[in-house]
Amino acid sequence: VFVTIKPFYGPYVPDSIKNNLKTILRKYSVAGIVTEIQDLKYLYVEVDVNAYYNPSLAPDSAALKTVVTNNINSFADSAEMNKYGAKFKYSKFQTIVDNSSSAITSNITKVTIRRDMKPLLNQAAEYELCFGNPFYIKNTNGYNIQSSGFTIFGQPDTLYLGDKPAADKKTGSLFFFRLESRNNPVVVSGNVGTIDYARAEMLLKPITFTGTSKK
């Protein structure tokens, strides 16, 4: 039996608490049933909002920005967006922005989705990331997905994850690259996994991570 728990504070339940819960549940479990407590897989939605407004109706742009930001934050903190199986509805989000003030005439919002992966350090493992929303291929030459930095066994440099679409533009391959400069990526390891753009799924072959960074 697999169990997930959404804590009030922080995204994950500490391992010590997981072990205590498993010990308690073991007293009530039926013979042959083993309880495994897994970390939740959060899907983060990041938005870049450009709202257009009539300045004669809202002379104070800073105040208008504050109202829009507060409404977005309230929506982000709502139970609707923080329950199991929640769905982000783009049209509803745009309506929330537009309805923030009668001065707003329209908005163009760019949406980026993100998952935070907790790798097993210093041990080889496969990884699967599922996003539930088709990936947009902006560049057929690759580098459509982005990751923060990480290190792997046998490579001293900080690496990043990149993608290369296949000819069908439905699937592709994953690779690791390092940055010699901001706009100068160098591929270090090719074909380290696969990506399905339509299904929004990525599968990494067995890899040994040795560290991660937030940049």
Question: Model-flagged regions — what are they?
Answer:
Residues 1-80, 84:
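Carbohydrate-recognition loop of C-type lectin domains
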Residues 143-186:
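Structural flexibility/helix-modulation signal
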Residues 1, 43-47, 107, 125, ...:
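Residues at beta-strand starts and edge strands
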Residues 6, 169-174, 178, 182-215:
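Surface-exposed interaction regions enriched in Ser/Thr/Asp/Glu
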